[in-house]
Amino acid sequence: AYVPTDGNGKRAAVLSVHGHWPWARVDPVPHARALGLVKLGYFVLAVDAFGAGERAIEPARGTYHGALLGASTWPVGTPLLGLQIYDNMRAVDYMTSRPEVDGDKLAITGASGGGNQSMNAGAWDERFKAVIPVCSVGTYDAYIGAACCVCEVLPDGLAIAEEGEILALVAPRALMVINATRDGHQFSVGEAEKSIARARPIFELNDAGKRLKHAVFDSGHDYSKPMREAMYGWLARWLRGEGDGSPIPEPEIKLEEVDTLRCFPDNVRPKSFTLMPAFVHEQAKKKLARAPRPDHRERWEAEALMMKTRLEQRIFGGFPRGVDWKVEPAEKSEGQDTREETFILYPEPGMPVPGVLVRG
């Protein structure tokens, strides 16, 4: 926690969440904004994401909670994205318990994966009165084929909503989306504009059009000083009622060494500390203990039918039923000892599968 020293009394507070920076919450990128905010009088809580930083299996520079590790939470029905939302909601519980914090003046911000955390937690937890995702907003459609972390993937998301609808859940609270002109396609200005266009009518329905802003910077993937200064101005307007939302110059800051910011400088953590693999195993035990134990054949047949239906719909995405298929012959040719026929099989409309039949 970063606690201002300029007097007593309750003050606005910011939850700072990190993206995939080498040192997680203590990396210079998130550390810089926390210092700027506390110098401007905000209480700041910076947290490590589950499986990253000091919550990694082996805390070190460059720890990563994605790939197979992050996907290991899916079989127990708790995607990493959902765990991060819950984590951040509990962080708000802690912040509001602090005597320095005004629980009616809370915000969340972060860049990259931290921007996605900001968008998602900001959509779900209405205690955040200002939400600022940075270098993260695009479209779920653009995620297809992109190298995103599993912590940013909403399973079955496109079957329910696009990213614009998630942004719209923030309304009528204040939302500033920050993008960079030289970012990846999935986080690009053009993709973000599509989502903001979907969200804007909802803000206007709530008489909150002025609470939605898109700020674009000539930059790569970052949370740069100009971006931070835009964030300071937006928070001043919507948390403190000061100014018109224009950027506020960053006070002079001096970055501290990474080791001075660690909770466990020697990497010795309490025995009660839960790592991701242990969490998944514990969840699996609890859920398996609730699995049905049929005691006769008829009950098993009923359970089996229910299980197959749930697996098909919730896990396998559903299978086509009653779909017409057809075969279109293409060419025939004869060799010395064989005959070949090429054809196109359509197992579903619009899905051609070429094939060759060889007769000897």
Identify the residue ranges that each predicted region occupies.
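Alpha/beta-hydrolase-fold catalytic nucleophile elbow
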Residues: 48, 109, 134-135, 178, ...
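Alpha/beta-hydrolase-fold serine-hydrolase catalytic core, especially in secreted/extracellular enzymes
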Residues: 9, 171, 178-354, 358-360
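Glycine-rich His-Gly loop
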Residues: 5, 16-22, 180, 347
